Amino acid sequence: TWIMRSDIAPHEASKKGLDVSVCGSCPLRQAIGGACYVTLHQAPLAVYKAYKKGLYNKAVDVTRLKGRKLRMGSYGDPAAIPFEAWEAVAQYTNGNTGYTHQLNHKAFDKRLLDLVMVSADTPKQAAKYQASGIKTFRVKVESMPLLKGEVECLSDTQGISCIECKLCNGQNKSVAINVHGRGTKAHTLKYGKGL
């Protein structure tokens, strides 16, 4: 799923700092120099343009999702969408994955924790969340060890895609992945000391 504004292209929203409505307080937002991996001028922009041309139905028959796998927020934070909408969709799917940085937002709906992982930016933050029973997803520098109870992302270790793995659904184990892609340098500079 693509969570984006309908009034401005995603890459423009990011450049202007108007992506808060879809990304919340995520520290990985490109607008604030974060290491978000989403290439906004590619797939998200294509989806936005298709929407503006009227190629997306405004009403969706969620039963058509029966047996399909759901990525909650290929771009955008799932917390930007009411829990009831996700619940209505997820009941028909064959598994889901998703991540949120909004756990500490005053309006965060904790029911979402049954469907998504909480993104943790540091080992200390991950350990704090995990101690309260929350499943976390953490991007780490390769030299950093896994925390007790964490598993390494199967994409890293076995080349299994997220949608096939489905471990990141808020119900299984906490997961950590080695930083990769174009945000590696920025992430390593900000979080490389493992605080």
What feature does the model see in each segment?
Residues 1-195:
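Class I S-adenosyl-L-methionine
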